[in-house]
């Protein structure tokens, strides 16, 4: 065990901007000064002279061994986000304003945890503690990231691959295209509903158990889809399948944060975040070739095989990474090995029940949507964009099959424009990071604290993307003539993909930093709005394109996006004042 540095500081010794980061560590059992015992990792035969050398005044002969451990380094942070994610569900409650310092991954954020003087509070034995997920090899951590990203990709691909089956489902079940589209809408609605329950459950039982259970049911509910005797069975199974698969869209971001320190987090989080947006574009591409050569059932057989492989990988290679649950396991082992029942982990001192946590995780997102104009407008903006993306699954076949004579597999290939655009948008991340760095530097030059930031500094990509999107939609709409080469609307769809990624990258980080105490709820509100808009838009998309024409239907969508474009600029300029008058946002 590596002893803590003598220069380790308490929360009283650091600037206010550092205190949030320290409170994060306390919430997941990471000591910021020599106050906690190093669990029982010291060798039993360690000499008393060594103990006295650590702190002679506190370790006389016969007393407990010294408590001298310091785990993850304190990182200056403007916002509190333990582990680097905003996916925890332990938001503060009314009447407990002082209990919560951030939305961190720690169990105990927003709940009572043992005070710093507690003698038997279990914490990590330094950075190299073998139980600490951040001590795993880089290869293993990246393999876990890739498995989580592939699982998320599988779920979102399942949402859109289904759209390739419409042509065969309608005559077989004697139903309309609108009813078939309900299968897409209900699945996406399930993706927005599931996190309300699965996210808080992961705070109590760990991420691994939620992954295994949810993905098992995701695989199980795929079977009724593949053998559905009627459309009602298909629709019910699709909704439940979406609920089950939503865990990797809501919980897996926390897994990435568990394994990587903040200075390492950017690239793995980018890889994971990209997968839910890339998946929908792959679905029609794969599904088009499947149904062109065989029946619609094989779309689900392929997904069952893929999901089965992912489930095996999850069971074999994805361990528990949630720090509070791991510390609880460590405390249980210590009590068993030492016979001392005083050893305790922070999560074991929670004063909130599972049902109460789930209830708050369902209520808080709607409070933010109803009472926070910044959260509401940014959620509407991102929801409209995802709704348009899913509407394209109905619009693309109309445009490219009717105007250009594409087959169903060729129509799937048309989605490569969106795919390339999104990948391009992801690759521009270093540009926005440099802009963010310049804004931070300007703030320092104007008298701000070194390293300090403002949530609004995350919005430049959203500002640009919010204007790129309507331009791309107008361009796409007015090039959907048979006389215009098919590559032109595909190019504009790629530009739409770039703008969509730029909008989301800024919105997500802004919400987490602007609402540090309620980051999980802010993200849940965004996810809920996005999912239900994405579920609703396809239901009227085809009718709108048929009644208004391809050009004017897309123009309506462009004006809808254009109406939301000024809001990121307003929030960039006046966000600090709005946050100052907010009951939920950071000042």
Where are these regions (language model features)?
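Intrinsically disordered, low-complexity terminal tails of fungal membrane proteins
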Residues: 1-140, 318-360, 433-455, 577-587
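A six-helix transmembrane bundle that forms the core substrate pathway of small-molecule transporters
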Residues: 118-587
